Regions:
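Flexible, glycine/small-residue-enriched loop-and-beta-strand segment within the central core
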Residues: 42, 69-174
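A generic, residue-level signal for flexible/boundary positions that often mark functional hotspots
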Residues: 15, 51-53, 65, 89, ...
């Protein structure tokens, strides 16, 4: 399933998680390790650029975080990102350079590449949003199937191939 491979979907130079993602074939393979990756990377970040704002939370000094935003770690907010009023970051999240997490948006277990817009009233869980992705207002990446079975990715553009992800929670892959 060539279309769904990380190397074909994402410009890895556009995320602080590029090296981490490069070890996987498919994006969903990276979801389980986001938390551990952040905990490992965070302490190595340049203290001239990032400040530690709590347990396993690193925020670039150039980022803007509204005082009403709720930040839970592990979390990295990269340079010039904007976290708006009442945004709720539940942890295991990387917010890329120049990205926007808007008001009343909830983020959980995600890699958000640089210059991504998740402007307002969104839920993004167990997802990877590629460089310059934009989710419209009120978008939800529902991350659990209604029948609670494992998620299977189907390639309708090629051979109709199916790959079982081994995951019960999987939101979206936006390239």
């Amino acid at each position: 399933m060539e279309n769904a491979k990380i190397k074909n979907m994402y410009d890895l130079s556009q995320s602080i998680a590029g090296e981490y993602l490069s070890q996987f074939t498919y994006p969903w393979e990276a979801l389980k390790g986001i938390s551990d990756f952040i905990k490992k990377l965070g302490p190595t970040l340049d203290p001239e650029i990032y400040e530690k704002r709590g347990e396993n939370i690193w925020v670039a000094k150039s980022a803007t975080v509204a005082p009403t935003a709720c930040l839970n770690g592990p979390l990295i907010i990269d340079e010039d990102a904007e976290i708006r009023h009442c945004a709720f970051i539940r942890g295991s999240a990387i917010i890329g350079k120049g990205s926007v997490v808007g008001n009343s948006t909830e983020i959980k277990n995600d890699i958000i590449f640089n210059t991504v817009q998740v402007p307002h009233y969104n839920y993004v869980g167990d997802s990877i949003l590629g460089y310059k992705s934009h989710m419209g207002a009120g978008s939800i990446t529902s991350n659990v199937k209604s029948d609670k079975t494992l998620v299977v990715v189907k390639d309708s553009r090629d051979s109709g191939e199916e790959i079982e992800t081994g995951l019960k929670k999987f939101g979206a892959m936006l390239g």
